[in-house]
From Swiss-Prot:
Belongs to the RNase PH family. This is Ribonuclease PH. It comes from Salinispora arenicola (strain CNS-205). Phosphorolytic 3'-5' exoribonuclease that plays an important role in tRNA 3'-end maturation. Removes nucleotide residues following the 3'-CCA terminus of tRNAs; can also add nucleotides to the ends of RNA molecules by using nucleoside diphosphates as substrates, but this may not be physiologically important. Probably plays a role in initiation of 16S rRNA degradation (leading to ribosome degradation) during starvation. One of its GO terms (molecular function) is tRNA binding. The keyword Transferase applies. Homohexameric ring arranged as a trimer of dimers. It catalyses: tRNA(n+1) + phosphate = tRNA(n) + a ribonucleoside 5'-diphosphate. Pfam families: RNase_PH (PF01138), RNase_PH_C (PF03725).
Length: 241
């Protein structure tokens, strides 16, 4: 069955990582996975949360949000609702966990980095695009710290592994890489996979949206995801070169 945008099952959407998109943050990246666009900024502050003080370790955390009209119908801002929704909180924590896997918190020292990932336009894969872009923004923030002699080591030693993420799923019985919204909405199986630049797993989230799935299907999806993440890692390397 043909995909909505004509891609082969194992092809990513066009990926673009534009560094320095915002003037003020220590690191900023506009990441595009096809029509999905996420602005990722990395803001550095000296010091760490109270519970972390005196440990010699840094801290990296994340916040995720969507613009009201990032989708085909407008959603109220969560600030107006007076609370952060469960989905938003879950994705924020996922991004934070994923990016902490990329950095040596001891080498970061008692500095904090907050990653803000704001979805400008959503067409599926917003959380995976956010993770992929946030890695590049975090790297630039660490480079900024190194230039101020606020780190014990070089940026490439502090950022000791790259991290990227991609969605995979079974749509119309076919394993597919990097689902857009139309595919995600009809997927029988849906996974979000976070990998390092060497293909090791950081996190795997998956559900059988329309029932159950086999071990063989899971293996096929993970193979697709690893290949996709390795391609994304190469895009990150090129963006940072």
């Amino acid at each position: 069955m043909a995909r909505p945008d004509g891609r082969l099952p194992d092809h990513l959407r066009p990926v673009t990582l534009t560094r320095g998109w915002s003037t003020h943050p220590e690191g900023s990246v506009l990441v595009e996975f096809g029509a999905t666009r996420v602005l990722c900024t990395a803001s550095v502050t000296e010091g760490v949360p109270r519970w972390r003080k005196g440990s010699g370790l840094g801290w990296v955390t994340a916040e995720y949000a969507m613009l009201p009209r990032a989708t085909n119908t407008r959603s109220d801002r969560e600030s107006v609702k007076g609370r952060v929704g469960g989905r938003t909180h879950e994705i924020s924590r996922l991004i934070g966990r994923s990016l902490r896997a990329s950095i040596d918190l001891k080498a970061l020292g008692e500095n904090s980095v907050v990653l803000d990932c704001d979805v400008l336009q959503a067409d599926g894969g917003t959380r995976t695009a956010a993770i992929t872009g946030a890695y590049v923004a975090l790297y630039d923030a660490v480079t900024w710290l190194a230039a101020r002699r606020s780190l014990a080591g070089r940026p490439e030693n502090v950022m000791h592994r790259s991290v990227a993420a991609v969605s995979v799923g079974v749509v119309a019985g076919e394993p597919r890489l990097d689902l857009n919204y139309d595919e995600d909405a009809t997927a029988e199986v849906d996974l979000n996979v976070v990998c390092t630049g060497t293909g090791d797993f950081v996190e795997v989230q998956g559900t059988g949206e329309a029932g159950v799935f086999s071990r063989g299907q899971l293996d096929a999806l993970l193979d697709l995801a690893v290949a996709g993440c390795l391609d994304l890692a190469e895009a990150q390397r090129k963006a940072l070169s």
